[in-house]
Structures are given as structure tokens and as C-alpha cells.
UniProtKB/Swiss-Prot annotation:
GO biological process: translation
UniProt key word rRNA-binding: yes
Role according to the record: Binds as a heterodimer with protein bS6 to the central domain of the 16S rRNA, where it helps stabilize the platform of the 30S subunit.
Record Gene3D superfamilies: Ribosomal protein S18
SUPFAM superfamilies, A to Z: Ribosomal protein S18
InterPro entries: Ribosomal_bS18, Ribosomal_bS18_CS, Ribosomal_bS18_sf
GO-annotated cellular components: cytosolic small ribosomal subunit
Gene Ontology molecular function, alphabetical: small ribosomal subunit rRNA binding; structural constituent of ribosome
Keywords carried by this UniProt record: Ribonucleoprotein, Ribosomal protein, RNA-binding, rRNA-binding
Name listed for the protein in its UniProt record: Small ribosomal subunit protein bS18
Subunit structure: Part of the 30S ribosomal subunit. Forms a tight heterodimer with protein bS6.
Presence of the UniProt keyword Ribosomal protein in the record: yes
Length: 78
């Protein structure tokens, strides 16, 4: 009994490249919350589908937003 060949998962498209967004604003918390897990961690590139440049921009924007107290460092207590 041989297994059927596994399909490759569909490649995710970078949201910022698709919509033509050039600047990721740290004040746009609604957008940045999509890239944070329920524990407050920044989601990986393979999970979000961002390109390398926009993933770096998102990470920087999230860190700036945390410094300005717009986003929490953690969401859940132990």
C-alpha cells in the first residue's frame, strides 16, 4: 500500500504587495493585530505569507507600537 503523493500547500501571497501598501504604520493597530498570535508573539513569515521585506517592516512596526503602548507585549497571563 503506497501513499498518494502529498500536495504542496498553496503559497500565500503577501498582503502588502497585493494591495500596494508601501509603508507599514505602527499606529495602524487593526492591521498589526493580524500578525500577532493570541499570546502576543509576532507570527512567522511562513504563517502570514508576507515577503521578507514586509515581514521585517511588520516586526519593526509591532515593536514600535508596543513601545508606544498601542499594542501589548503579552495578551494572556499564566
Amino acid at each position: 500500500m503506497t501513499k498518494a503523493p502529498a500536495r504542496k500547500p498553496k503559497k500565500k501571497v503577501c498582503v502588502f504587495c497585493k494591495e500596494g501598501i508601501t509603508y507599514v504604520d505602527y499606529k495602524d493597530t487593526n492591521l498589526l493585530r493580524k500578525f500577532i498570535s493570541d499570546r502576543g508573539k509576532i507570527r512567522a513569515r511562513r504563517v502570514t505569507g508576507n515577503c521578507a521585506q514586509h515581514q521585517r517592516d511588520v516586526a519593526t512596526a509591532i515593536k514600535n507600537s508596543r513601545e508606544m503602548a498601542l499594542l501589548p507585549y503579552t495578551n494572556a497571563a499564566r
